[in-house]
Design a protein with these regions (language model features):
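Conserved phosphate-binding/catalytic region of the ribokinase-like
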Residues: 148, 174, 178-218
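Positively charged, low-complexity intrinsically disordered leader regions
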Residues: 1-7
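Short, glycine/polar-rich helix-capping loops at beta-to-alpha or helix-loop-helix junctions
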Residues: 146-153
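Substrate-binding N-lobe of the ribokinase-like
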Residues: 8-75
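Conserved phosphate-binding/catalytic loop of the ribokinase/pfkB sugar-kinase fold
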Residues: 41, 66-68, 78-115
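Short beta-strand/loop segments at the ligand-binding rim of alpha/beta enzyme cores
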Residues: 132-141
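Short gly/ser/thr-rich secondary-structure transition/capping motifs
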Residues: 60, 96-101, 140-146, 174
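A short beta-strand/loop micro-motif in the catalytic core of glycosyltransferases
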Residues: 158-165
Length: 218
């Protein structure tokens, strides 16, 4: 926790420090497992990642496809200011060292009814999307953390595209909810679009069907 975000060339004292296991993939796998879904988590951790694997397993996630590679696991350094806003710096680590052979092996485990859930934290994503599509595996993709590379991914082969307002602006080169959804419908008409709006809820759109769901206070 910091009074404000650190600036270039500045050293700033923090008032609190906490360390948590996480990453979008880990958090989503655990959430799905707790909701009663059978989850098989595939990916890579570094030599420091034994506790990450244990955390997944302790929450009912199948970790048989999690590989250990040399080096460090992925990390995020998050600054939180006094208003609760955050600023995040990511180190990809092992998340960026998945091997093509391991990817193919993981996708070969898919059975009828399975769904592939992806985020933009790992390497070889175009290959993964193409390979999963070839195997007729439905794909759910969240492009966070957003990067220019996403614009060249085969998004036309994604079944569900989940994104927030900022990511939507980058994907569509448009501002405003309606403009973002309109452009993405034109460019990726096969995708079912899910636009998350924080405290304002979420919008689902596929073709002419558009559904808005309010956020639930927690």
């Amino acid at each position: 926790s910091v009074e404000r975000f650190v600036q270039s060339g500045e050293t700033l004292a923090s008032s609190d420090y906490q360390q948590f296991f996480g990453g979008k993939g880990l958090n989503q796998s655990i959430a799905l497992a707790r909701a009663g879904v059978q989850v098989l988590h595939a990916g890579s951790v570094g030599s420091d990642g034994h506790n990450l694997i244990s955390t997944l397993a302790d929450n009912g996630v199948d970790v048989s496809l999690v590989n250990e590679v040399d080096g460090a696991s992925g990390h995020a350094v998050i600054q939180v200011d006094k208003t609760g806003e955050n600023c995040i710096m990511l180190f990809g680590g092992a998340n960026q060292r998945n091997q093509e052979q391991s990817i193919s092996h993981a996708l070969d485990q898919a059975q009828k009814g399975d769904i592939l859930l992806l985020q933009n934290e790992i390497n070889h994503l175009p290959l993964i999307i193409e390979s999963a599509s070839d195997r007729k595996i439905p794909i759910v993709f969240n492009p966070a953390p957003m990067s220019d590379a996403v614009l060249n991914y085969p998004l036309d082969k994604v079944d569900y595209l989940i994104f927030n307002q900022t990511e939507g602006e980058a994907l569509a080169s448009q501002r405003g909810t309606d403009n973002i959804l309109h452009r993405l419908r034109q460019e990726h008409h096969r995708c079912k679009l899910v636009l998350t709006l924080g405290s304002e809820g979420v919008i689902y759109q596929h073709g002419e069907q558009k559904i808005r769901v309010d956020a639930v206070p927690t």
